[in-house]
């Protein structure tokens, strides 16, 4: 059960380094204070993985997001933006760790990175909530597995196995 739960989530990149947080910040193009609707992760030609099981609801390209993929995970949608390549298609069923694209610097971008934006019931939310959820599941599972290895095995009669 714990291994299945651990495998039910994934970080979007093999190495995680946050360059820019969700919320108001100085716009790198204008220098003015502007709302940043996601987080930016450091990346260099990295595979972008789905964080949970879901369905690809949109793939496309625009001036702002560049090449992007949007996945639906229940009430959440997660968009991965500024990709150099899209490696999935609309309607595809996706599992955690499935590669959906390669990081890049397409669209309104100052350099290569992965921009992740999340919506809950259509409203923008901080993607760190999803990353914190993934971290908590992984920590819970690792702790439970470690505890199960430390517990002495009991025989049906209640004694320890030898």
Residue ranges and their predicted role:
Residues 1-14:
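Long amphipathic alpha-helical scaffold segments
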Residues 11-150, 154, 161-162:
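Catalytic cores of peptidoglycan-degrading enzymes
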């Amino acid at each position: 059960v714990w291994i299945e739960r651990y495998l039910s989530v994934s970080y979007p990149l093999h190495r995680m380094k946050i360059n820019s947080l969700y919320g108001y910040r100085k716009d790198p193009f204008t220098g003015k204070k502007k709302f940043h609707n996601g987080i930016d992760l450091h990346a260099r030609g990295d595979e972008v993985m789905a964080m949970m099981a879901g369905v690809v609801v949109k793939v496309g390209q625009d001036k702002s997001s560049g090449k992007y993929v949007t996945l639906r995970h229940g009430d959440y949608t997660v968009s991965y933006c500024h990709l150099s390549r899209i490696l999935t298609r609309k309607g595809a069923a996706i599992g955690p760790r499935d590669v959906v694209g390669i990081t890049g610097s397409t669209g309104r971008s100052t350099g290569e990175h992965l921009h992740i934006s999340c919506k809950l019931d259509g409203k923008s939310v901080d993607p760190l909530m999803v990353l914190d959820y993934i971290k908590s599941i992984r920590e819970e599972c690792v702790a439970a597995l470690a505890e199960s290895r430390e517990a002495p095995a009991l025989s049906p009669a209640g004694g320890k196995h030898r």
